[in-house]
Each structure stands twice: as structure tokens, then as C-alpha cells.
Amino acid sequence: MDSWFILVLFGSGLIHVSANNATTVSPSLGTTRLIKTSTTELAKEENKTSNSTSSVISLSVAPTFSPNLTLEPTYVTTVNSSHSDNGTRRAASTESGGTTISPNGSWLIENQFTDAITEPWEGNSSTAATTPETFPPADETPIIAVMVALSSLLVIVFIIIVLYMLRFKKYKQAGSHSNSFRLSNGRTEDVEPQSVPLLARSPSTNRKYPPLPVDKLEEEINRRMADDNKLFREEFNALPACPIQATCEAASKEENKEKNRYVNILPFLSLAVSKDAVKALNKTTPLLERRFIGKSNSRGCLSDDHSRVHLTPVEGVPDSDYINASFINGYQEKNKFIAAQGPKEETVNDFWRMIWEQNTATIVMVTNLKERKECKCAQYWPDQGCWTYGNVRVSVEDVTVLVDYTVRKFCIQQVGDVTNRKPQRLITQFHFTSWPDFGVPFTPIGMLKFLKKVKACNPQYAGAIVVHCSAGVGRTGTFVVIDAMLDMMHSERKVDVYGFVSRIRAQRCQMVQTDMQYVFIYQALLEHYLYGDTELEVTSLETHLQKIYNKIPGTSNNGLEEEFKKLTSIKIQNDKMRTGNLPANMKKNRVLQIIPYEFNRVIIPVKRGEENTDYVNASFIDGYRQKDSYIASQGPLLHTIEDFWRMIWEWKSCSIVMLTELEERGQEKCAQYWPSDGLVSYGDITVELKKEEECESYTVRDLLVTNTRENKSRQIRQFHFHGWPEVGIPSDGKGMINIIAAVQKQQQQSGNHPITVHCSAGAGRTGTFCALSTVLERVKAEGILDVFQTVKSLRLQRPHMVQTLEQYEFCYKVVQEYIDAFSDYANFK
């Protein structure tokens, strides 16, 4: 840049000197003037009234560049003539000295005429290339000065063009003669690759984001989340979108374009990176991982690293080695993952070929097949039985559906050559189903459970774990980074999210695609740091209970009290209770501290002609196997009974669990919303008592509910638990275990619609029932329990669920009673 500045400065000086010389001579017939004019208008014309006809000859000199960059001036004489009886066209009025500058910057030599008029021309204005006319001699000093300045200018232009061509050639060589393009942070946009390679963009800021010690994690996250995540957005935007020059020659071939789901999410054929970028990466890369990245050669290429996954070519099929997938390093493990796009219909066979060739045992899927009615991933497995994809046969062995994810076990085998048939392999697919269509999960609890399951089930000597979403960068990158940073947290007691994301973006661009995903990573790490792994094998529950009853050194609390203290420290999000806090709805709330959150409140149809009639104090609650398993509701008030039954009808709830008496300690806890005999109507809903049966600790009532407007009826069963005392908790867990079993049996017969659970306020006893039902179902299915995280999840869905320390302790005791009482206990050991 300095040399360019000197050249331009030198040229400007010469022009200035020449201009000054030119102004010292009065214009005459032979004087040549240096001006700057438009290339489309070589001489300005001015109409003046005259009885004679005139012609103006303008001699222009403009540099013409030949292909070999030889500069030669071409002389063009512009002749403007106009023949008229009463008018002439004269030369533009002359100016004494100075330089006239036109917008396009082309320099011309124009002959000036003071009073001379040439011979008239026949016809209209025309332009012809001629040789310059000879004019009477005059002082040639200014002409020489102008020509010197012009020659100097042409030399400068020539030098600039040569320098530009040399620099362009250098960049072209650095691109390895392939299509290269860069991607920006944020959402995927379908843009065509550039034909000219661009240098990798440096981070947009020089600000450093060093690794964080885990004991500073909470403080730093709170600081960066202030002002609507301002500092987190700055940190995310500082990430290099692609810290290397992406060479995607194979992905850009015509034969492979249809294999890519998004045109700007492509795997790298090889990695080319500047020396500065290599140094920056090495500063933030652990020593073990640095060995995997490799050394840069003299051109700044990482010659020993190829992140694109190569398939074994199929004979006779061009470019059959291509699949949109990239190797990604783990924390200290080379190529731990393969980040892939979600298979398309035409690439499913290639996907299974990759699974077989890479000896993969675990597939992680972080998208649903369709989101917002848009196909995100082709279903690459059969629903049941077996199916053959190319030369790989896939059969479904087992499917387990849980609230946050589904686990599928496949048996795969290569087909074709019977004599050389390979043995069968077991593949486990972990399909995370709780990622919302927009944004990120509202809590990282489900993702951490999911990740732990993946880590535990992946065989030690298996190939790379294949992770895919739709594009294979956003959610995929989020999963990979959380996995790596948890490993780093355990190994070094610190995390380096910024550094690790920067490094894996050198293997696949746009890994971790949005600032929301970036913040979610930090939230997951903080969740793990604050609460740890609280899952227990059922065989270790008794030992755990003995441990948590012991006092914690340095405190007055035991372990159980400390656990519950952590739960009560979870902030209640009062700003997310808008509808329940509306003046028209306040009278519908029994307890003002327990109002449903906006994101999961139960909505009922608006009554025609009446505003604010879609509200009821009730929340959807997730269970063990499915979302919205429960409706946690307050006990109806006298004026909200109709809303309660409208909710039951709208959401097809066939089971109601009541955990309070109508009156306790002289106070009304719940309005009676069913008839003692016969039938009663609440608006369009009619309720008829068909049967009532007393059990050991609860009453079962069979109710026929009819919607008179729709002229339809349903059978509803109410389980009214009497074993909860007015003060404290039940003396044992037997009654609770029995009613949970009865409700689950009813659900199997009536369909898995939400179970409506209520006490008085719909939090303490209601939360305890939901927690126990969820925990016991998992104990039966997996032999694992996690009371702490179950209650924590409930409290994130509705305020004050499991309201007291006694209720929290009761959850542990009931689970222990269940394990001790049932013969299935032998299976847990």
C-alpha cells in the first residue's frame, strides 16, 4: 500500500506542475489544453446565434490497452457540424488556463480556437479517426510540459495495473484453482459459491476470549447475559465463520450438487489456511489436538488433513466417493465425530455406506423429520422389519420412546457377495426429539441426559460417532461442543467454548450456527457444573439415602436439605406469566403465587362474544415417555368449574387425580365439580355420576361427561386420594404407589391423553404425584432414578412444584418402598 501511495503522490505532483505551466500562456490558435472530460461526450456544444456555419475539431488522446498491456495513445478527431441558414455551431467558449475534470477521469487533448472558424462540413455531426491538423506555430513550452505530465501518468497507470495483475495471480494460486467461498455467522442462506477464491476472514475483533475456570462460569455467564445477551452476541460474532480457505471442489461438481441439502454447507476437500491463522489456532489448541491438525507448508496449507469423509468409489459411477460429511475432532480425540447433513432421499444409500465403511456404531440425530411442515431429513430407516439401502440391509430390532429422545437399535449387514459376506453389526440411533422448531430447548437437562446416554452406549473401539441435524452444522455443532467441553471441564477444570468452536469451524464451516445455540452451550455447562450427575442406580439408593442424611461439614444442613435448597434457589420467572396476571384473570387464581407460565399454560377455546375466556390455572407437564403427560391444575373455584370441565373436554383428558379434600382445617380447598347423585350442567358441559367405588386409600368415580353443543359423550374416571393428611405427608408410600398404578392402568385402556392432577393450589401435592409417577416409571423401565432432576424439571414448568422439604423427602421414601416391596427388585441388581 505504501508503494501505491508514493506512485499516486508522484503522479499528482507532475500533473500539478504541468497545470501551472499551462496557465501561464494565453490561449491561441496553436495552444493545446489539458482537460478531463467524459468518454461519452468529447466536446461540449453551445448554441449561439450566428449567420454562418462552423465546425469544431476536438483532438482527443486516450490510452488504449492491448491484451499484452502495451500502452499506445489513439488520436481521435471529433467533428461536430451543423448546417443551417440562420445559425452556426461554435466551439465551446475558451477558458484561460486550469484543468477541467470530468466524472470518469479520461484525459483528453483538445485544440482551442479563439476566433478562427474552419470550412463548413456537409451533413450532420460525425466522428472520424484522423491525423491531427497542422496549425500555425506557437509557443511549444506548455505543450511539452503537458506531454511530459501525460507520459508520467501513463507510466504510473501501467505500473499499477502490473502490480494488480501480479497480486491477483498470487491469490489465484493460493486458491488451488478451485471454487472457494466463505460463509458468515448466523442462519443458513442458500448462496452460490464464488468462482474466485477469497482469503479467510479474520475475526471481526481483536478481543480475546480465553478459557474460563469452572468456578468463574456462573459469574461470567450472568455478566454476558446482561442487557439481552449483549456480550454473548459480541463473542459469537467475533468467531471466525471459517478460519480457513474452504476448498470444496468435490462438493461443487455438477454430479454432486444434488447430494447437498444446502448449497453453502459443504465439506472441505482439504484445508488451506494462512500462517497467521495456523499460529492463532496453535495458541488455543491443546498439544494433543495440535498434532492432529498438522503443520503448514510454505503456502500455508495443512497438507496432511482432509476433513471430508471419502466413500469407497463404486466402479463405473463417477464421483461416488462423495458425501456431505466432515470429520470433527473431539476434546482430545482425532476424528471422534462425523458431522453430516441429514440424508436426502437420493443420498440415503450413501449414508448407510458411510456408516458401514467407517465402522460407526452410534448415530446421533438432532432434528425431526419435518419441522414447520418442511422436510429436514429423509427417514433413512424402516419403521419395522427390514429394508435394503444400496448394499446395506437394515433391520429394526428395538425402539424405545422417551420424553426427550427415542432410541432405535438396528442390525445392519452388507449384501451382494455371498461368499465374502461380512458379519452383522448392531447400530444404535439416538434421536433427540425435544429441539423446538425455533430457538433452543428451554432447559439443557434433556440434552445432558441424552449426551450421557450416547457416551455410555458407544462401544470403546467403534468408529466415529455420526452426528447429523438437517444441515449438519448448527445443532450438530452444539452437541459436539457440549461433549468436548464436558470432557475439558473434567480434565482441566476449565472450558474454552470460543477456542473450540473456532477450531471445529476449520473442519466444517458454521459449526454452532446461532448465538442462541452458543448461549445454550454455556447453559448446559453451567447446569452440569452446578448440579452434577444426580442419576442413581436403584441398587445404590439405600446407600445414597444414608449419605444425604449426614451433616455436611461446615454447614448446619444435611445432604438432603442442601439438595432441596438448590431447588428452591431456582428463579421463578414472574415476567412469563402474562395471561394469568391480567386483571380479568386474577380472580380465577386460587393462590396468586402459583400462576402458569405462558409457554406451557393450558389454553381453552374462547367463548363466543366473551373476552379473556381462554384462561384456566393449569400447566402442561412432561412425563417420562412423552411430553404433556399431565395437566397440573389448581382445584376449581366455584366460578371456574365450567372452565375446568371445558379444559377436560378440549384436551380429551380421561383421568382426573384429586389429592385434596373439599375442605381442610375449616378452609375450602376445592369446589365440588361433580354431582353427588344424578347429573349437573356447567354451560355446555353436563356431568353425570355413573358409579362410585371406595378403595383402600382412594375413591374411584366414573363420570359421563356430555358436550351438549357437540352432542358427544365421554367416560371420565376420577381418582380421589384420601391418604394425604391436612398437615404434613402420608405416613407411608403404599397408598401413593397403589393410586399411581391404578391411574396408569386406566391410561392404557383409555389412551394416552393428559392426566389431570390437582390438589388445592396445584403445586405441592400435585408436583409430588407427578414426580413420583415419572420416577417410578423410569425405575421400572431402566432401573435408574433421578429425583433431583425430576423435581427440578417440574419446577421449571410450574412454580413451587413439590413445595416443601417433607414432600421432597417423601419422593425418596416412596421409591425406596417400591423397590423393597416388589419382586422385580431382583432384576435391578
UniProtKB/Swiss-Prot annotation:
Protein name as it appears in the record: Receptor-type tyrosine-protein phosphatase alpha
Binding site residues for substrate: 437, 469-475, 513
Alphabetical list of PANTHER family matching this protein: RECEPTOR-TYPE TYROSINE-PROTEIN PHOSPHATASE, RECEPTOR-TYPE TYROSINE-PROTEIN PHOSPHATASE ALPHA
Any Pfam family: Y_phosphatase
GO biological process: insulin receptor signaling pathway; integrin-mediated signaling pathway; modulation of chemical synaptic transmission; regulation of focal adhesion assembly
Catalytic activity: O-phospho-L-tyrosyl-[protein] + H2O = L-tyrosyl-[protein] + phosphate
UniProt keyword Translocase, yes or no: no
Domain Tyrosine-protein phosphatase: 232-528, 560-818
EC code(s) of this entry: 3.1.3.48
Tissue expression summary: Widely expressed. Highest expression in brain and kidney.
Record text on subunit structure and interactions: Part of a complex comprised of PTPRA, BCAR1, BCAR3 (via SH2 domain), and SRC. Within the complex, interacts (when phosphorylated on Tyr-825) with BCAR3 (via SH2 domain). Interacts with GRB2.
Entry annotated with the keyword Hydrolase: yes
Membrane-crossing segments per the record: 143-166
Residues of the active site: 469, 759
Single GO molecular function: protein tyrosine phosphatase activity
Keywords: Cell junction, Cell membrane, Glycoprotein, Hydrolase, Membrane, Phosphoprotein, Protein phosphatase, Repeat, Signal, Transmembrane, Transmembrane helix
Family: Belongs to the protein-tyrosine phosphatase family. Receptor class 4 subfamily.
Post-translational changes noted in the entry: Integrin binding to extracellular matrix induces phosphorylation at Tyr-825 which induces PTPRA localization and recruitment of BCAR3, BCAR1 and CRK to focal adhesions.
Glycosylation sites: 21, 47, 51, 68, 80, 86, 104, 124
Organism: Mus musculus
